[in-house]
Regions:
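Conserved ATP-binding subdomain of kinase catalytic cores across diverse folds
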Residues: 1-191, 251
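Short amphipathic alpha-helical segments that mediate assembly, nucleic-acid/protein binding
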Residues: 18, 61-65, 70-78, 86-91, ...
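Conserved aromatic-histidine-acidic binding/catalytic patches
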Residues: 32-37, 115-119, 227-236, 246-247, ...
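Active-site-proximal segment of zinc-dependent metalloprotease catalytic domains
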Residues: 189-199, 240-246
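Conserved kinase catalytic-core segment
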Residues: 42, 46-49, 53-54, 121, ...
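A recognition module on extended beta-rich or small alphabeta surfaces enriched in W/G with H and D/E
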Residues: 166-181, 228, 295-309
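Catalytic and binding regions of secreted/periplasmic enzymes and modules that target cell-wall glycans
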Residues: 129, 179, 215-232, 243-250, ...
């Protein structure tokens, strides 16, 4: 409880990845574990703008990680991971153990772990200022930076009358007794099944039957029409504004329905709530046509709001991760949103532009830096990265915010392209 309200306390994705890596190794999936460790190193390199040796750091982290798994503490964590019982305290202990074993990992681990929480607190605060334009006060989330002794965590207020947006968008396509998580798990089992999976033959047969039922064209058409009817009747206010503002703040894979909620507003219209805003990852202003997969940027949407529907629903913006293994369902969801909400995208882009035009960027960057000041009392913690590196990343993020804040303001008040 914080301020008399129930909150969910979380650590960031980097520590979560350490826990996931332990779980992968407990299942014998060493390559998957190495991949997750690589994500952490990649995050450090991104935040420090290449100022670390990625290959050497990856090797150090991998060696320290597997050495940790051979310790009594590591074996204990692996046993807990087998049953999905790892908690925040556990992943923090894994982090501490790795740094204690190899102090050279203090900065490469500490920077992404620290900025997981700083960036969430700062970016969520910014997005909340926009969400005040269409959400009632009790539906605006928060992400408060917590600094218990020698640690940094995020506390997010629970919104009990909201439901996950991914559940809301997909339920019309699923049998009543099947959750989205169960459907995704079935798809994952089918995809990863070996040709001679005789031991799981019955389970796989059930999974394939479920997927065939979901992907049946009749079911897909019926689900799409049900979603179209719901959206036309009750709307989905804030969807495009949420997608756009998170895009301007540099989000990538976290930009999608699995990081949003939906609630019924006082006017009985559905409202989207953005939660777990990571932010400050990439400069996503420009399109990236040379990527292996084309990626839209936010610049053209700001300059030409009429393009918003196509751009913001493109898979390079609205992630399909929420429907992993259910591509046909995602395709129908996109079609339904496009048909039902085609007149909503452009006005919501204008709302985001007006919000940026009124944004006090200097105050916003000062607020971002103040989050770093909250952590000065933790400088003696063994995992904390060097203060100079923390200031370097704060300056990077402030620069990103300054750049984003300037362009939309020009587009609102200046000549139109």
């Amino acid at each position: 409880m914080l301020d008399g309200q129930e909150h969910l306390v979380k650590t960031g994705i980097s520590r979560s990845l350490l826990g996931q890596a332990v779980a992968c190794c407990a299942k014998g999936q060493v390559e998957k574990a190495t991949k997750r460790l690589g994500y952490i190193v990649g995050s450090a390199a991104r935040l420090l703008e290449g100022a670390i040796d990625k290959q050497a750091t990856q090797q150090r982290l991998t060696l320290a990680f597997h050495a940790f798994l051979d310790t009594e503490k590591g074996k204990e964590m692996a046993e807990k991971a087998k049953t999905g019982a790892l908690d925040i305290d556990d992943v923090c202990r894994i982090h501490d153990s790795l740094v204690a074993a190899d102090p050279r990992l203090r900065n490469p681990l500490g920077i992404p772990i620290l900025f997981d929480v700083i960036n969430v607190a700062a970016a969520q605060d910014l997005v909340n200022a926009l969400q005040e334009r269409y959400l009632s006060r009790q539906h605006i989330p928060d992400s408060s930076l917590l600094t218990p002794p020698s640690n940094a965590l995020i506390a997010s207020r629970l919104i009990h009358d909201a439901q996950p947006l991914d559940t809301f968008l997909t339920k019309a396509f699923l049998p009543p007794e099947v959750s989205l998580a169960q459907a995704k798990q079935a798809a994952a089992r089918v995809e990863s099944a070996a040709p001679d999976s005789g031991a799981q033959a019955d389970e796989l047969a059930e999974d394939r039957a479920l997927l065939a039922r979901i992907n049946d064209p009749v079911n897909l058409r019926a689900g799409k029409q049900a979603l179209v009817d719901t959206l036309r009747h009750n709307g989905l206010d804030g969807l495009f504004a949420s997608l756009l503002v998170r895009l301007t703040l540099g989000e990538a894979s976290d930009l999608g329905p699995d990081n949003m909620l939906v609630v019924s507003g006082e006017d009985a219209r559905h409202k989207v709530i953005s939660i777990d805003v990571t932010g400050f990852r990439y400069d996503r202003e420009q399109d990236a046509p040379s990527d292996p997969r084309f990626r839209h940027g936010w610049g053209d949407v700001i300059r030409a709001p009429a393009s918003a529907l196509d751009v913001l629903l493109h898979k390079s913006v609205m992630s399909d991760r929420y429907a992993t293994g259910l591509k046909s369902v995602h395709a129908m969801v996109i079609q339904a949103i496009g048909e039902a909400l085609d007149g909503q995208a452009t006005p919501e882009v204008e709302m985001v532009k007006q919000w940026y035009a009124a944004l006090d960027v200097d105050s916003a960057t000062a607020s971002l830096r103040s989050l770093g000041d909250q952590l000065k009392g933790m400088s003696a913690a063994g995992w904390m990265p060097d203060a100079a590196l923390v200031n370097q990343v704060l300056a990077r993020n402030s620069s990103l915010l300054n750049h984003v804040g300037a362009c939309p303001r020009f587009c609102v008040t200046g000549p139109q392209a």
